[in-house]
């Protein structure tokens, strides 16, 4: 017990002592806390004082430099230093304004709620356009609005605005953001254009503000006005902004705006110009429904309208189509191209193109010698053969025989008389496109053999003659009619008789005509169509060229469709009638014999070149650029010019045509004259030279 008692008291003492210790500890703790608090307060005070001073300094600095941060300063500088300077110069002492500003600023900043209604209003305005307080636009508007209230209010407003501007301006990013989003700012400031604000401000200031302040305001107004006229647009857009962020004057913002606007316009213009141009040039020209490979190229040609373009197109198409004939319209080649529907279409010229797209069948038709045959029919029994000259006759044929009246016109078959070999080649080229059209209705092409006469009526004499090649008349026919010449490649042309190919674009295939020689006898594609038959020299020295082009030469799968009952027969069809036949067949049926050799060659070449596919027309595998010249020569001087030669001619024509493309219509017409001389090998050579040039 004692122990316990002793312990008890001891414990009590311990406990008692403990409280003391606790109290001491507590006291110490409190003391420390107080010290810390004091230190903290000191620090806070220092910070606060520093902050205030910094703000004051900043305000003074900013004010001196211009209201608002660097950006606002810049803007103001652009808009007018007087506005900013006036406050500086104004009676308000920078120190006084600074102090006042500092106080107000402090109040406003710390308890923004306490901010005077003016400031709040300004802020609201600012925020309206830009919800963020950063928007510099609000400060400007608020400042201006404050100005009218009186010198003190104005000063106060300025001070307020400065702080807000400073705060907002302090972050360039904020300014940039606000500036970059001028639409809101502009929308807000725009309503109160600088000029408007100044006016109102000026009036209010004059009455309300101190004389000094009003003076300042006036200066500001003047500056603003000056600025406005000076930078009407800039002030409007930038001023609006500047008002908000004192950046109104900032030309930088306006510049970005303007540049943006300008860029937009120029891009639009560029886009409209460049793209539209390209589109017009490239896309529009192509047929609405161009055959993918050929037509795309073809349309270009078509657009080019010049034979040269056609030639290029043909080349591409022909190549793509593999209708090597295509362009040349070597009869075989032509057919071959015909076989390629696309090629055919490409073959057809721009006009042809049009017709091709719809008349394609026609083209084929005419091309198909069935229709051509008709023409040839008209001319001779050669119906097919004549038809064979679809290209040549095609023009006429087209119009006459086929609905492709357009093509006919295009072809200007009448114009194509072989007689004008010189002109014919170039013209032929031009008409060539039309020729494509001549293909005439698909039926024609279908009936190719059957229809020989069908086109004939349409074909009409010219066409018939052309087609016939019988046409020797062709000689009589103008060069244009001579168009057949490009079929000139007759051999290939004849080959083209194959209907199937013709259908698509037989026309180019005047070849069809050659092929068509015998509308009735469609030979197997494989069938060799040899224009073994030598045609009598006929008018053309070409005389008997044996258009030996075996169908195989044409190697047109389509040749099978050739209506040539037998190559010979086709050719033979009307040897007499075809006297020109060689020309007609080999060259363009229509082309008169004399013309045929050269004219045909040339025409053929031209035609081929035009179609560009001529060479492509593998029709005459033989056709080769090198051979082309020879072909021209051969056509001009070699009676025995064979289809293969014609094929070569096609190749040549293609090559030459391509070169010739630059010549254009004028060049073609020039060539036309030489075409007349074409019969003379020398002339032919010169003609070729021209083309090369």
UniProtKB/Swiss-Prot annotation:
Compartment(s) where it occurs, according to its Swiss-Prot or TrEMBL record: Cytoplasm; Nucleus
UniProt cross-references to Pfam families, sorted A to Z: TORC_C, TORC_M, TORC_N
InterPro entries registered for this protein in UniProt: TORC, TORC_C, TORC_M, TORC_N
Sites of N-acetylalanine modification: 2
Annotated GO MF terms: cAMP response element binding protein binding; transcription coactivator activity
Modified residues annotated as Phosphothreonine in this record: 169, 501
PTM text: Phosphorylation/dephosphorylation states of Ser-171 are required for regulating transduction of CREB activity. CRTCs/TORCs are inactive when phosphorylated, and active when dephosphorylated at this site. This primary site of phosphorylation, is regulated by cAMP and calcium levels and is dependent on the phosphorylation of SIKs (SIK1 and SIK2) by LKB1. Following adenylyl cyclase activation, dephosphorylated at Ser-171 by PPP3CA/calcineurin A resulting in CRTC2 dissociation from 14-3-3 proteins and PPP3CA.
Leader sequence residues: none
GO cellular component: cytoplasm; nucleus
Modified residues (Phosphotyrosine): 488
UniProtKB keywords: Acetylation, Activator, Cytoplasm, Isopeptide bond, Methylation, Nucleus, Phosphoprotein, Transcription, Transcription regulation, Ubl conjugation
Keyword hit for rRNA processing: no
Phosphoserine carried by residues: 70, 86, 90, 136, 171, 274, 306, 368, 393, 433, 456, 489, 492, 613, 624
Disordered: region residues: 1-30, 174-210, 271-307, 335-463, 476-548
Cross-link (Glycyl lysine isopeptide (Lys-Gly) (interchain with G-Cter in SUMO2)): 234
Region (Required for interaction with COP1): 209-215
Bias kind Low complexity: ranges: 352-378, 386-424
Chain positions of motif Nuclear export signal: 271-287
Coiled-coil annotated residue ranges, if any: none
Residues with the Asymmetric dimethylarginine modification: 51, 99, 120, 123, 161, 168
Family: Belongs to the TORC family.
Protein's job: Transcriptional coactivator for CREB1 which activates transcription through both consensus and variant cAMP response element (CRE) sites. Acts as a coactivator, in the SIK/TORC signaling pathway, being active when dephosphorylated and acts independently of CREB1 'Ser-133' phosphorylation. Enhances the interaction of CREB1 with TAF4. Regulates gluconeogenesis as a component of the LKB1/AMPK/TORC2 signaling pathway. Regulates the expression of specific genes such as the steroidogenic gene, StAR. Potent coactivator of PPARGC1A and inducer of mitochondrial biogenesis in muscle cells.
Assembly and binders: Binds, as a tetramer, through its N-terminal region, with the bZIP domain of CREB1. 'Arg-314' in the bZIP domain of CREB1 is essential for this interaction. Interaction, via its C-terminal, with TAF4, enhances recruitment of TAF4 to CREB1. Interacts with SIK2. Interacts with 14-3-3 proteins, YWHAB and YWHAG. Interacts (probably when phosphorylated at Ser-171) with YWHAE. Interacts with calmodulin-dependent catalytic subunit PPP3CA/calcineurin A. Interaction with COP1 mediates nuclear export and degradation of CRTC2.
Protein name, UniProt field: CREB-regulated transcription coactivator 2
Protein's organism: Bos taurus
Organism phylogeny: Eukaryota, Metazoa, Chordata, Craniata, Vertebrata
């Amino acid at each position: 017990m004692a122990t316990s008692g002793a312990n008890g008291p001891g414990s009590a003492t311990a406990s008692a002592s403990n409280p003391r210790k606790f109290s001491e500890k507590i006291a110490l703790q409190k003391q420390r806390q107080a010290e810390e608090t004091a230190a903290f307060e000191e620090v806070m005070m220092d910070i606060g004082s520093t902050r205030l001073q910094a703000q004051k300094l900043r305000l003074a600095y900013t004010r001196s430099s211009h209201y608002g941060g660097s950006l606002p300063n810049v803007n103001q500088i652009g808009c007018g230093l007087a506005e900013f300077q006036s406050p500086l110069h104004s009676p308000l002492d920078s120190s006084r304004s600074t102090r006042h500003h500092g106080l107000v600023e402090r109040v406003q900043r710390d308890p923004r709620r306490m901010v005077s209604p003016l400031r709040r209003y300004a802020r609201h305005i600012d925020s309206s356009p830009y919800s963020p307080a950063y928007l510099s636009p609000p400060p400007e508007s608020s400042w201006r609005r404050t100005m009218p209230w009186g010198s003190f209010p104005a000063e106060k407003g300025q001070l307020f605005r400065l702080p807000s501007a400073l705060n907002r301006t302090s972050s360039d990013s904020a300014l940039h953001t606000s500036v970059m989003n001028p639409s809101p700012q502009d929308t807000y400031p725009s309503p109160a254009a600088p000029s408007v604000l100044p006016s109102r401000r000026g009036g209010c200031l004059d009455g309300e503000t101190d004389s000094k302040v009003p003076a300042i305001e006036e200066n500001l107004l003047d500056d603003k006005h000056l600025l406005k006229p000076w930078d009407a647009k800039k002030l409007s857009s930038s001023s609006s902004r500047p008002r908000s962020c004192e950046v109104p004057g900032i030309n930088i913002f306006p510049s970005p705006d303007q540049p943006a606007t300008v860029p937009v316009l120029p891009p639009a213009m560029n886009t409209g110009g460049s793209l539209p141009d390209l589109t017009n040039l490239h896309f529009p020209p192509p047929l609405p429904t161009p055959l993918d490979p050929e037509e795309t190229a073809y349309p270009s040609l078509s657009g080019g309208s010049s034979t040269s373009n056609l030639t290029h197109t043909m080349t591409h198409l022909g190549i793509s189509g593999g209708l090597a004939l295509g362009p040349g319209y070597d009869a075989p080649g032509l057919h071959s191209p015909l076989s390629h529907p696309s090629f055919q279409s490409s073959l057809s010229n721009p006009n042809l193109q049009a017709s091709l797209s719809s008349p394609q069948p026609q083209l084929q038709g005419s091309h198909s010698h069935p229709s051509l045959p008709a023409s040839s029919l008209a001319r001779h029994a050669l119906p097919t053969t004549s038809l064979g000259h679809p290209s040549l006759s095609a023009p006429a044929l087209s119009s006459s025989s086929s609905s492709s009246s357009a093509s006919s016109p295009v072809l200007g078959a009448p114009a194509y008389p072989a007689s004008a070999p010189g002109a014919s080649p170039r013209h032929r080229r031009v008409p060539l496109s039309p020729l494509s059209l001549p293909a005439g209705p698909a039926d024609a092409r279908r009936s190719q053999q059957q229809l020989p006469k069908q086109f004939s009526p349409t074909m009409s004499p010219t066409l018939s003659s052309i087609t016939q090649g019988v046409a020797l008349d062709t000689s009589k026919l103008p060069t244009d009619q001579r168009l057949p010449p490009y079929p000139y490649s007759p051999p290939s042309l004849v080959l083209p008789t194959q209907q199937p190919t013709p259908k698509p674009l037989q026309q180019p295939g005047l070849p069809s005509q050659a092929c068509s020689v015998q509308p009735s006898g469609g030979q197997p594609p494989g069938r060799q169509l040899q224009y073994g038959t030598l045609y009598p020299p006929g008018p053309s020295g070409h005389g008997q060229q044996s258009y030996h082009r075996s169908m195989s030469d044409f190697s047109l799968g389509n040749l099978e469709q050739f209506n040539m009952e037998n190559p010979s027969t086709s050719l033979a069809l009307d040897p007499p009638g075809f006297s020109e036949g060689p020309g007609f067949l080999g060259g363009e049926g229509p082309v008169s014999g004399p013309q045929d050799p050269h004219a045909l060659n040339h025409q053929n070449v031209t035609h081929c070149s035009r179609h560009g596919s001529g060479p492509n027309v593998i029709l005459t595998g033989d056709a080769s650029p090198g051979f082309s010249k020879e072909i021209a020569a051969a056509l001009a001087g070699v009676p025995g010019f064979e289809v293969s030669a014609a094929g070569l001619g096609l190749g040549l024509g293609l090559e030459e045509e391509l070169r010739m493309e630059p010549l254009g219509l004028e060049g073609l017409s020039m060539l036309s004259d030489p075409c007349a001389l074409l019969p003379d090998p020398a002339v032919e050579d010169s003609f070729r030279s021209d083309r090369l040039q």
